[in-house]
């Protein structure tokens, strides 16, 4: 089996499995990771988190990589998210942007234990990127730097951009929750002393001007819509609340969220009792409130109707039709039926 057959889709789903789990492919990936590390450091287990497949263009896998800093005999390890892409476009000419992103990571000393944060392996049409490298989200490096986080959060609370009674901590532990180069990033900030603060989450956005160029969400609009939705639910649904963001920091194009703990609604859905029914009714009331909100609240000029939704489903399910043709046919029939029923509506 070869990479060209996998990326084209000719190898079907077995090709994806081969790239992700075969001994040959895993050894190649481990060797490339080892080349990015100091002499004594070694890559450990790789845990796949997500896989994206664009037939004919690219296969991308996102891993959490455990790194042994001083060999496998030591207990000193760290976990770093990495993104691995296979395809003809992995060597695209974006060297200038990468150089800028690497320089930012070095300036904030967030590359260690890696000596380099990117590697190309042309023989396999493969590119590896290591968190926090991202040519499009260049602020990710500084948002991964505990020193910058400390200063950023101190300024946020001192300036009143976000209300807090206990965030005067001097140390923050930064963990990458979602590392998706070019697409999205989520970071977790834990106070070094749990008694001195609460855990926060940071959703990173492309700067507003670039977001328009790439047709991507911008943080300012997301923050505004989330706050408006939270206000609407609080007003119309007694005893229910939406997750309300704490602040939008334009300098870093990041939205801060508090940590919430609770039982997932899906857990209640598995139980058939009065308590489950009560929570499901409350969730339904919240959804009804959301559905009745003015469309203008989202701040979008383009309409989004059933046809637009179906186009989106068709686009996102294209890999299924390539890898599992019989499932793709079932999806197509289901969408045709949805169009037919929609046309009958008054």
Regions found by a protein language model. Give the residues of each.
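Conserved helix-loop functional segments at active or binding sites
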Residues: 235, 340, 344
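Short, solvent-exposed loop/helix junctions and linker helices
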Residues: 180, 277-280, 346
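AMP-binding/adenylate-forming domain of the ANL superfamily
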Residues: 184-188, 221-228, 310-315, 332-339
């Amino acid at each position: 089996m070869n990479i060209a057959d996998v990326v084209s889709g000719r190898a079907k789903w077995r090709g994806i499995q081969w790239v992700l789990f075969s001994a040959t492919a895993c050894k190649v990936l481990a060797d490339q990771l080892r080349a990015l590390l100091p002499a004594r450091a070694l890559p450990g287990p790789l845990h796949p988190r997500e896989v994206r497949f664009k037939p004919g263009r690219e296969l991308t896998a996102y891993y959490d990589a455990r790194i042994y800093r001083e060999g496998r005999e030591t207990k000193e390890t760290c976990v770093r998210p990495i993104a691995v892409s296979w395809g003809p476009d992995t060597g695209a000419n974006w060297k200038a942007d990468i150089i800028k992103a690497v320089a930012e990571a070095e300036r904030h000393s967030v590359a260690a234990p890696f000596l380099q944060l990117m590697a190309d392996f042309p023989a396999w049409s493969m590119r590896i990127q290591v968190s926090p490298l991202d040519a499009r989200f260049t602020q990710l490096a500084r948002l991964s730097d505990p020193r910058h986080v400390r200063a950023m959060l101190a300024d946020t609370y001192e300036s009143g951009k976000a209300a807090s009674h206990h965030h005067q901590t001097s140390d923050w532990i930064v963990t990458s929750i979602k590392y998706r180069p070019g697409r999205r990033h989520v970071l977790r900030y834990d106070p070094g002393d749990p008694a001195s603060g609460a855990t926060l989450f940071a959703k990173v956005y492309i700067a507003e001007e670039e977001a328009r160029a790439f047709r991507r969400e911008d943080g300012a609009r997301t923050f505004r819509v989330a706050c408006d939705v939270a206000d609407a639910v609080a007003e119309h649904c007694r005893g229910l609340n939406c997750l309300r963001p704490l602040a939008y920091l334009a300098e870093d194009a990041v939205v801060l969220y508090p940590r919430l703990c609770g039982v997932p609604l899906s857990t209640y859905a598995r139980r058939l009792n009065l308590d489950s029914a009560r929570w499901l009714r409350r969730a339904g009331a919240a959804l009804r409130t959301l559905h009745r909100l003015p469309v203008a609240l989202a701040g979008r000029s383009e309409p989004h109707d059933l046809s637009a939704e179906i186009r989106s489903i068709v686009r996102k399910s294209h890999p299924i039709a390539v890898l599992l043709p019989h499932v793709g046919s079932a999806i197509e029939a289901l969408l045709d039926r949805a169009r037919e029923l929609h046309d009958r509506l008054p």
